[in-house]
Amino acid sequence: MAGDQLNVLNALDVAKTQWYHFTAIIIAGMGFFTDAYDLFCISLVTKLLGRIYYHVDGSEKPGTLPPNVSAAVNGVAFCGTLAGQLFFGWLGDKLGRKKVYGMTLMVMVLCSIASGLSFGSNPKTVMTTLCFFRFWLGFGIGGDYPLSATIMSEYANKKTRGAFIAAVFAMQGFGILTGGIFAIIVSAAFEAKFPAPTYQIDALASTVPQADYVWRIILMVGALPAAMTYYSRSKMPETARYTALVAKDAKLAASNMSKVLQVEIEAEQQGTEDKSNSFGLFSKEFMKRHGLHLLGTTSTWFLLDIAFYSQNLFQKDIFSAIGWIPPAQTMNAIQEVFKIARAQTLIALCSTVPGYWFTVAFIDVIGRFAIQMMGFFFMTVFMFALAIPYDHWTHKENRIGFVAMYSLTFFFANFGPNATTFVVPAEIFPARFRSTCHGISAASGKLGAMVGAFGFLYLAQSPDKTKTEHGYPPGIGVKNSLIVLGVVNLLGMVFTLLVPESKGKSLEEMSGENEQNDESSSSSNNNSNNAVSTA
């Protein structure tokens, strides 16, 4: 890479934080807001789907989704997300970030609406169409991971880059929060308009016909924030790093950045390509330079998501233990949606959202490595603290302590590896592979999410087949599952050692794209500082 290319990039690295940086955070962050809303809102309505479509006359308890149907409805979006992360990650490097960025939103908008319009003459066909549209919804969501992270990293200055990328990711917390609040509003409105007896009083009447609209409305509203952001995304210029380093047009890169950032960049003639940086993805040279880095980002994200998505194992027990969700038969269908949404909203407000924003505040102060290592460490400690004396926590008088431990575990997931595993892959790989490698890392994480959400759902079943949930085979029990999760977090600490610290360093320094041009880089940096000071 030549000095004239470095000129525009160094100007971005030293540019002061300005309004367009925050605009980019909002534009990219609204995608993640939508992602979180769409992925998490399904958990608010699965109980309702069971009552509506799988009611059994004469049963003591309301209908529930069979294990295979529940796994499909909850997990199919993860499968789509994994595929979308790989495909759009690759496409973002092939065609450019800007060209692909709007596609993901359109897929999300169309499939959010279509999910709420799922149709069929019997439960099987309704669930099939719902799963079909949620797969493609996940496909669009998956594309947002590598593209949003890459775009934000390539726009940001090196001083606050970590906070900017983490802020985009932190919008997930608000998406979860909004999903819960909206479900509370919708269910409260329907309960007021269409009151119904509890299940134990009148099983059939406890689910009013209008309840079928509740889950559809909640799913469809996910299209709104994505649709509102589409125009803004279409107006974002291509990132300077893609234009200069991949498209090899430093002049256009300088022109594009001068339009949106208050930085004076002299448009110089096109530089020559550095042959030492022309190796391909997964080539011998790539593996030599970045092989361990990619192993580090994929393994830590995989291990983190196993633990993070295993929270489904304990939520229902925790909510019931502290009285947030009473037994299902003591509520009607819409009341159950209200109680579940209220519980999830409180968890998001007290644990999830603060953890995200602690990362935003401290990531450029103490660094990515320290936050990730600290997060895995405390997750390990709290998982073992829950597991080893598990029988102690099952006593009613000790359950508040269990809830506190549980909340701290996921606070340190968010003020820890859940955020840093998203940030780091967008910083340490060359520009021409950045989106692809982030997509690979994210897809590895989503594979871990499937293991955590569904593998452990089976694994955590009681070894005594008479005590397993309906339709599930015997497992190893919750205590042993917690021990396994503690070991998973411990492995996360080990693999974090493969991930380099990127705090305060330029993307080109981290990726090695300027290692042959130290002198020209230094010269260009001086020029850039002069340009910025006059801007």
Curated annotation (Swiss-Prot):
Induction: Slightly induced in roots during phosphate starvation. The keyword Membrane applies. InterPro entries: MFS_dom, MFS_sugar_transport-like, MFS_trans_sf, Phos_permease. Signal peptide: none annotated. GO terms for molecular function: arsenate ion transmembrane transporter activity; phosphate transmembrane transporter activity; symporter activity. Residues 506-535 are annotated as: Disordered. One of its GO terms (cellular component) is plasma membrane. Residues 1-24, 92-99, 153-161, 233-289, 367-368, 421-438, 502-535 are cytoplasmic. GO terms for biological process: arsenate ion transmembrane transport; phosphate ion transport. Its main location: membrane. Mature pollen. Disulfide bonds: none annotated. SUPFAM superfamilies: MFS general substrate transporter. It is a multi-pass membrane protein. High-affinity transporter for external inorganic phosphate. Although related to the sugar transporter family, it does not transport sugars. This is Probable inorganic phosphate transporter 1-7. The gene is PHT1-7.
